[in-house]
């Protein structure tokens, strides 16, 4: 089992059975840094993955350095919005697992390194107030207290906090126009956000049948060159 986050630990659970009944249980955390021995079977499986020809195929080109959660999250959300015909898209910062993409060729393997979880993209219709509720809830999950958790495409937003707690949120289209209150907009997001971020909304999310990685690869293939614009979010403590 896995425990903690960012591969800090592996969790080991030992069960003692009497017949079909568990009579004792022992749990412990094993720091990954202490695990120095290599398993040849696992090593061979990893090598097979990295040698896969389809993963090393060039799918597009990065024209500028794309760095940090914001820049990379903008790429992910741009892809999910464009491929699914959504007005907006959100991506949790914790799902971005590399630091930057350098200018040059982009391969499918680089997409899987950036976004390795295989989450399915969903589309849900939300009002501006429901999106604000989502952003407020996301901040309570947020360990990056100096920045927002949810990266976005299709809009810009500013989250104002008081004593570290989310307060008011200002949202606008990139050209500065306000969103229409009460209107339902198509919003793309991954199924982790759908299941983990408990926020009030009236309409159910619908799966697209495609993972976020498949969606990003499709988007990059169609664009050939990528250079997402940033920043789109702000966090201000009042």
What residue ranges belong to the model's regions?
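Catalytic centers of hydrolytic enzymes
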Residues: 3-238
